[in-house]
Curated annotation (Swiss-Prot):
The gene is LDHC. GO terms for cellular component: cytosol; extracellular exosome; mitochondrion; motile cilium; nucleus; oxidoreductase complex. GO terms for molecular function: L-lactate dehydrogenase activity. Substrate binds at residues 106, 138, 169, 248. GO terms for biological process: ATP biosynthetic process; flagellated sperm motility; lactate biosynthetic process from pyruvate; lactate metabolic process; pyruvate catabolic process; pyruvate metabolic process. It is found in: Cytoplasm. This is L-lactate dehydrogenase C chain.
């Protein structure tokens, strides 16, 4: 006797099991799952794979997402501890790592996370040799460098989430001060994703009107409106959120979704993400820092050459020095 399925459906051709737009997320903590839900709701993938070592949590997260399948358009959600589940991914998002503790700087995390990267990156590259790797784990700039070295991939295909979120926070806070939506407030933060990041006040504008032309002291210590405090708030944001709720998740998840969309859809949008800066702005070492990058299907296809003023260039070099002082002593 035929089954209900056989009576209902007549197969005409065999299914094509190969995903065309597969994304893997390594790490199913708060950040990984925020990335997952953001990507699913934006319909960026036809398959989403989750990888983690905590098998019960991993299965629970997978089932929870699968049960929401009616509400998004990703046809397949899989999970596993073995990296074979990630095979043939277009993008692999790395969120795994030791979580930042209250009061702990991103740089203090680095050595704890190096060993984790060594355990996962070779398997990622083995199963998805043509992928782009998007590193989100902190300290993201140094870990992106480490992932690049371990992976053997072209530098253009290993990208750190970098200052994409810092710049979003910057624009939000500028918008709050002006009463304007952040999409209409333009401003960039470059350098380290963290305490030594560099705000480019010279380029901050609304509708093409540079705020520096309205007040040349904007963003300086002598600025009576205290615009400089906005950058201080950007730096303190993560620490404050961690103190209040234990971790950051939603904003970084949305930021990652933004980057993934630019890559998969070949949008060639410009984002401040972490990439190799050796040879730029007088940097002589192999360092990854955020600068404006054009993102498309090949990863970082171009960088935008910003005309930094003397103060901004000095701060950028200081940011590079901060990272180099940690990176040069790493053992991996």
């Amino acid at each position: 006797m035929s089954t209900v399925k056989e009576q209902l459906i007549e197969k005409l051709i065999e299914d094509d099991e190969n995903s065309q737009c597969k994304i893997t997320i390594v790490g199913t903590g708060a950040v990984g799952m925020a990335c997952a839900i953001s990507i699913l709701l934006k319909d960026l993938a036809d398959e989403l794979a989750l990888v983690d070592v905590a098998l019960d949590k991993l299965k629970g997260e997978m089932m929870d997402l699968q049960h929401g399948s009616l509400f998004f358009s990703t046809s397949k959600i899989t999970s596993g501890k073995d990296y074979s589940v990630s095979a043939n991914s277009r993008i692999v998002i790395v969120t795994a790592g030791a979580r930042q503790q209250e009061g702990e700087t991103r740089l203090a995390l680095v050595q704890r996370n190096v060993a984790i990267m060594k355990s996962i990156i070779p398997a990622i590259v083995h199963y998805s040799p043509d992928c782009k790797i998007l590193v989100v784990s902190n300290p993201v700039d140094i870990l992106t460098y480490i992932v690049w070295k371990i992976s053997g991939l072209p530098v253009t295909r290993v990208i750190g989430s970098g200052c994409n979120l810092d710049s979003a926070r910057f624009r939000y806070l500028i918008g709050e001060k002006l009463g304007v939506h952040p999409t209409s407030c333009h401003g960039w933060i470059i350098g380290e994703h963290g305490d030594s990041s560099v705000p480019l006040w010279s380029g901050v504008n609304v509708a093409g009107v540079a705020l520096k032309t309205l007040d040349p002291k904007l963003g300086t210590d002598s600025d009576k409106e205290h615009w400089k405090n906005i950058h201080k708030q950007v730096i303190q944001s993560a620490y404050e959120i961690i103190k209040l709720k234990g971790y950051t998740s939603w904003a970084i998840g949305l930021s990652v979704m933004d980057l993934v969309g630019s890559i998969l859809k070949n949008l060639r949008r410009v984002h401040p993400v972490s990439t190799m800066v050796k040879g730029l702005y007088g940097i002589k070492e192999e360092l990854f820092l955020s600068i404006p990058c054009v993102l498309g299907r090949n990863g970082v296809s171009d960088v935008v050459k910003i005309n930094l003023n003397s103060e901004e260039e000095a701060l950028f070099k200081k940011s590079a020095e901060t990272l180099w002082n940690i990176q040069k002593d790493l053992i991996f």
